Amino acid sequence: MPRARPREETSATWSLLPLQNPMAVAMHRNIAQVPLTSEPVMELGLDVSFEDVAIHFSQEEWVLLDKAQRLLYCSVMLENLALVASLGSCTGMGDEDVTCEPAEEVVCNTSPSPQETHLLEIPVPALEEAWHQNEFLSTQPVQTLDLSRTGSGLKEDSNRHWKSYSGEKSCERDSHRATAMSSCRSHGLTEPFIRGKDGEEALSSIAGVQQQGACHSEQPSTGCLQQQATCIREQPYSSAKCGQALLNGEKHCKDGECQKGSSCKHTLVQCPSASSEKRPSECSKYEKAFSCSYKHAQHQDSHSGKRTHEHSQHEKPFSKKCRLNTQDRICPQERPYKCTECGKAFIYKSELVYHQRHHSARVHYECVECRKSFTYKSNLTEHQRIHTGERPYQCEQCGKSFRQNSSLFRHHRIHTGERPYECSECGKSFRQIFNLIRHRRVHTGEMPHQCADCGKAFSCKAELSQHERIHSGEKPYECSECGKYFRQFSNLIRHRRVHTGDRPYKCSECEKSFSRKFILVQHQRVHTGERPYKCGECGTSFTRKSDLIQHQRIHTGTRPYECEECGKSFRQCSSLIQHRRVHTGEKPYECIECGKAFSQSASLIQHQRLHTGERPYECSECGKSFSQSASLIQHQRSHSGEKPFECSDCSKPFTHKSDLIQHRRVHTGERPYECHDCEKSFSRRSNLVRHQRVHT
């Protein structure tokens, strides 16, 4: 039975407790405090029970204690309980050598759990129950002990003491338990928060003490029984409604109505007094309501793509603070969960289970529109936005919207200029990590994606997909203006500029604009004089790589472009296109001055100089100017005496290639120019013109 208190205790009395030590607390309650060593008790042969050293509080008194007083109270009670347990297990009768029954040791649950963190908030009757439960102690074998030097009667009294709690005082414990449960429910707690896992009491997680009994073993090296408990895990959030706090008293997440706190934002418990149907916060974009304002704020962040919480070490952003806290607890280098199929490692077990669906090839979710199947529901949700056209994530800067939140987050880096992914080899940075991975293959030379038809390898899968359309002939992108199809979407975008006349790339030197960026880069080399592409055979340099490739065909003799009509082959694709117009008679380039048409744009440009009188090519020797660069080159040979064209039959050299062609007709007898009036033929066109004057 609890001891009768000799005097009335008030709240003012309890406010002085933080200034007193455990001994003073016990003296204040007129309860004898047993020293924290068992030797004096052994020598005096006292009959000690746990009730002799216990301190009892009512619920009204317990509420008045602050967190330091509660922790001190629990620590002292654990010490006393450990001491009484060691005394009860190490005493015997008389001078006989007996073997003690297996003692029970205080075992602490070191695994973190929500139940442990709520321990200091439960009322004192529930703590009293926790001390007297048999499940609180786990059995540990003890060595055979020599108890001849100990007093008699302690074991019997101790056994009677524990029996009284398990038998005679069962009704009292039941009433304590009922009171504790009702009090806990009023605080928003239920029984699982009081009892630990597998029946162990939550009290086992309180910061405890290590006690050694003064028992003597037959073997000198055998240690005595030890009891210890571990420190309680601090939780930064608590319930302010009940007037209780935990160790540090911080409350990061609060419900607006009941001011109840939580250790994580997404686990904030709603006040039981609040109506479950009341949802004061509503999204203005979607008709979705939230019971807590912080959830509404998180939902709105998902539309804007904000990630307000950033890890201090890894500079990784998070949209929720609880995910940031998880990142603090586990370093990304620690990935304990490894896939047995592909060897990929993960930080969390749930991620491993999520990943293993790829290997199982199970299809769970199917689109009702196109019957496409997906392994994960989130992928199906994102896919369905293609059919609905929904783009819920909008950029606040430019108004561009996206189907996925991650796409909006990456898009924000265009406005901020952030490039978080840097190459360790060359220092080049990128906005997206897959661009960095693809760039690294430039240094390593890795080409993991290979074409099954021609064996050509590529550094990224997108390039392989585009290349495979060459074999399949697929051109999925169609121009809405002219109906022309393209293999790549980027080619369609560039083609549209033909219709719109858009030239977004402008030269800063001469104000000339271009429809494509790489053409601007090539043009700027005219101003800088840069010629980065050099021929390994003759040392000739070029401003464009395509010019170098075409030039190298002169050395190799390669003519990959062949005409289907006459079989003539060419080194350049543009030359083949121009040649085909000879067969079709197409002349798309027309002079606006005289209406004369040409098959090549270069011929039109040269012709227009006749109307303008422009002669941009001037000889540096004599100052004579020409309208065509070829004419200037031919003229300069008259000063140098160079005759590069030689006849293979008679070895006669010529200054111009046209002169060589006409000369060879002397050896072949060819006369391609024929008069329509008398059917007379000539080897030169000039001779035909002179002959036709006879008929006129």
UniProtKB/Swiss-Prot annotation:
ZnF C2H2-type: positions: 337-359, 365-387, 393-415, 421-443, 449-471, 477-499, 505-527, 533-555, 561-583, 589-611, 617-639, 645-667, 673-695
Cross-link (Glycyl lysine isopeptide (Lys-Gly) (interchain with G-Cter in SUMO2)): 349
Keywords: Isopeptide bond, Metal-binding, Nucleus, Repeat, Ubl conjugation, Zinc, Zinc-finger
Taxonomy, superkingdom: Eukaryota
Annotated SMART domains: KRAB (SM00349), ZnF_C2H2 (SM00355)
Segments for region (Disordered): 300-319
Main location: nucleus
Entry GO terms, CC: nucleus
InterPro entries in UniProt: KRAB, KRAB_dom_sf, Znf_C2H2_sf, Znf_C2H2_type
Entry's Gene Ontology BP terms: regulation of DNA-templated transcription
Domain KRAB residue range list: 48-119
GO molecular function: zinc ion binding
PROSITE patterns, per database record: KRAB (PS50805), ZINC_FINGER_C2H2_1 (PS00028), ZINC_FINGER_C2H2_2 (PS50157)
Compartments, as annotated in UniProt: Nucleus
Pfam families, sorted: KRAB (PF01352), zf-C2H2 (PF00096)
Known role: May be involved in transcriptional regulation.
Family stated for the protein in its record: Belongs to the krueppel C2H2-type zinc-finger protein family.
PANTHER family assigned to the protein according to its UniProt record, in alphabetical order: ZINC FINGER PROTEIN, ZINC FINGER PROTEIN 819
Protein name: Zinc finger protein 551
Species name: Mus musculus (Mouse)
Gene: Znf551
